[in-house]
Amino acid sequence: MDMDVMMISMCILASTFMAPGWASTSGFLRVPQSQSIVENEAADFGCEATDSASYLHYEWLHNGREIAYDKRVYRIGSHLHIEAVQREEDVGDYVCIATSLASGAREASPPAKLSVIYLESASVQLLGSNRNELLLKCHVEGASGDEPLQIEWYRDSARLASWGNVHLEEHRLLVRQPSPSDDGLYRCTASNAAGRVMSKQGYVYQANIKCLPRLLKKNQKLPESWGKQTFLCRGKRGGSGGLDQALSPAPEDLRIVQGPAGQLLIKEGDSAALSCLYELPAELQNQRIQLRWRKDGKLLRHVELGGALPIPGHAHDSGKDALLREDARLVLHKQNGTLSFASIIASDAGQYQCQLQLEGHAPLNSSPGLLEVIEQLKFVPQPTSKNLELDAAVAKVHCKAQGTPSPQVQWLREGSLNSSLPDQVEVDINGTLIFRNVRAEHRGNYTCQASSSQGQISATVSINVVVTPKFSVPPVGPIETTEQGSVVMHCQAIGDPKPTIQWDKDLKYLSENNTDRERFSFLENGTLEIRNVQVEDEGSYGCTIGNSAGLKREDVQLVVRSTGDGFAPEETGGDGFLVTRAVLITMTVALAYIVLVVGLMLWCRYRRQARKARLNELSIKEAGGDQPDASVTNGKGSEQEPCLSKQRNGASGKPKSKSNGDAQKSDDTACSQQSRSSKKSVYEQLVLPRSGLSELLQIGRGEFGDVFVGKLKASLVATSAQSDKDADTEKQHSNSENGSGGSGSGSGSGSTTLSTLNEKRRSKTSMDDIEEIKEEEPEQSALEQLVLVKALNKVKDEQACQEFRRQLDLLRGISHKGVVRLFGLCREKDPHYMVLEYTDWGDLKQFLLATAGKVNTATATSSPPALTTSQVLAVAYQIARGMDAIYRSRCTHRDLATRNCVISSEFVVKVSYPALCKDKYSREYHKHRNTLLPVRWLAPECIQEDEYTTKSDIFAYGVLVWELFNQATKLPHEELTSEQVIQRSQAGTLEWTVAEATPDSLKEILLSCWLANPKERPSFSQLGSALSKAMQSVAEK
């Protein structure tokens, strides 16, 4: 019976598979469907001919060719599965072919098309620009399948829509009759299922306006042709106002033969050159002609071509529209107008244009050129290993990569792809590895891979699942015992890894090596047992538990009673008397406590009101009016200034006393907390009005904000100097009063000794002492003082605020000619400004590069001569004296290098703190543990333990002297990457050698600056003495 049924089925199947093929798709129950898949996601094509699948064989064709199956593309039954679709390999038509095993008949399904959705980059292209319209196109490298790309346009930061004279048509933006209100930076964004990208470079548009030019000469008359149609056009501050368009055109024989190329694609780190070949007629040789290079419409570099005086600057060539930053990478060649880049960085991308400016004529512009930078593939920042708390709801490990084109990021676990990651572990679109409900099986090694057309990079991190240590049996106290008794203090903990337990007494660690083993026993479960207790055992005992997840601590007080202590029994009274006595004592103590509390409340209220009254009086005196400062009367100073409100003095000028157990802070690790007699905030004493600053020009960006160079009114400089003198006088007066008061009436010998020492100091004052104590007075004849202004932009970043306060405290307490002065602090509104002394020659490193011939001097015919050995020694000696002053003020610098020193035209060098770590000197900093650090100048203990001392400044000073003798033309260990420098420094294998030009008498002491043991390094006074002897020996030769 079964055989008959099988034969009938075979006959029906054979009749279905009619040669040469089946009719249309009637034989298919399910055919593959066309689909669009996001790149790197999976795709599935279904195919089913009849319910009797066991008598059919299925094959798949891709673009007419049979598919070769592998681990990524494979068949599941009759269906086709593609893992991680790739657009270069998988795009096309897919056909399913079913073959009958009985008859051999074949039938093919209709082709199903696979489209890959991806999105790489976007850029803005100029299609046309004139007075009547502006036409831009958003060019996108990507595909969206059947769905259109979503294009959005932005002017500056405002999103545009079709309204008024703005029209959006698919990928194009049309602005009809553009006006000054349409000026700005135009950028576009593109989005689809694969993500969203914004154009890295945009198009800067500036409307052309006919305006009245200013009179260049006295009594100059207007042309009659202007007549009544002449209007005065006032533009906003910083704008050009279109004045150039009203000037007469440039002569025809003055022309730019060749401008920058239309589009230039350069890899990051390579060199590049933008050409601007010009022709200058002989009759214009003595005219005022200036060659300018602009980037995105802003002035970048300029050089005088003619023999006359320089052309006065225009309003649009200064202030915010100028990019005249000191950058040794950029060189403008006067002979041919070429702008060359020594090493391209990502921020160099943009639109460049050169122009010739002849006095009294409109500028002659070249055609614009677009410079695009192929950013190197790298992790920003490098992924790091992490400890995850067990049962945490969400934990993330970030992996961000940058490059051109944008890289694709994926995570692997011990060689497996994303699909085989553990349960509840996923990767989001930004490449972040997300753990949900962390479990023990999540621990292991994970590798982040970033790939693009440049190649592939990877970083492996270790994920460890831990449990924060907790006390299962905490120590309980206080504990009282008698002398020669026994005490057991329990301390047990749980956690993963198993926590370690450490006991200490009065903050001094206890172990079997420093205790009496016959009396002290440390049990395995963490319990501490003390037998035969002595009086000296009394104190505060602490139990600290910890593992890789953290530390916890509990204290217990041990009180030891002498065997003779206690109350004698009452001889005459009975039990009733004892009870009555106990009740009376209890009631007396309670009443005294109540009276004490009420008295303290009244006293505190009185003191608070008196303090408010004194603050109001001080604020009225400072303001010179009758209204007190709102920050004092309302008590809102801390809300208005969250960064600087924590540094306040107490009610008295005396420092808080420390307990015996508190270790005194080292003078090498932190600034000492000196007593202050003033009750105002130390930062209120530094306040300068923001209106006193002028001509601010940004020179770079630091860790907590922008850095400017500007000018400060001389009257404010004199006021700042006088306030510093008053503060020093008041401090000396308070110190003398404290010294006399502490001696008492019976300390006449002490006062005599003090006066004798003062007489000796006055009689033995040397030139070195005068140099150290003397404060530089500002020139009274000068109306303005050149200053360096550091802005605190990251007001809500606690780490940035802490560094801002540290630099304020560093420079506030030092008055030495080798260290720049802190003129004051502008904090009426955000951002806060720190105002420091600056010099006319500026950055010491740029000065060294100029003397070495590495910096282009636009107006000079030849580079300045190189420094002699005696001059280099003089510079090093001045810096050593300044650093010695910082050491004696019990502070550390932490970033000593030639870039952070300034030099004047009088060859006076001062230690400063510009710290331009974000752009100008970004190559000299490296992000380590989420902080930008000058790793090539840091001592090993700074990198390993984050421990900064004067000895670490000595290490950096040795590197600075190495820079001086090398003219700052190369970086320390420039053959190594920053990661390799960190690794070798931590391993102790980083070898230092002095520069070749170093005198022999200095080599030994400079090599000792780089010793691994900080205690073996010399002091700044020893370095100063060695430099002084070296200068004498060089002078004698």
Swiss-Prot record:
Domain Ig-like C2-type: 24-109, 110-199, 251-365, 368-464, 469-559
Compositionally biased region (Gly residues): 739-749
Amino acid composition bias (Polar residues), ranges on this chain: 658-676
Keyword line: Cell adhesion, Cell membrane, Disulfide bond, Glycoprotein, Immunoglobulin domain, Membrane, Neurogenesis, Phosphoprotein, Receptor, Repeat, Signal, Transmembrane, Transmembrane helix
Disulfides per UniProt: 47-96, 138-188, 276-354, 399-448, 491-543
Glycosylation sites: 336, 418, 430, 445, 513, 525
Topological region Extracellular: 24-582
Compositionally biased region (Basic and acidic residues): 723-734
A Pfam entry, by short name: PK_Tyr_Ser-Thr
Name listed for the protein in its UniProt record: Tyrosine-protein kinase-like otk
Organism: Drosophila pseudoobscura pseudoobscura (Fruit fly)
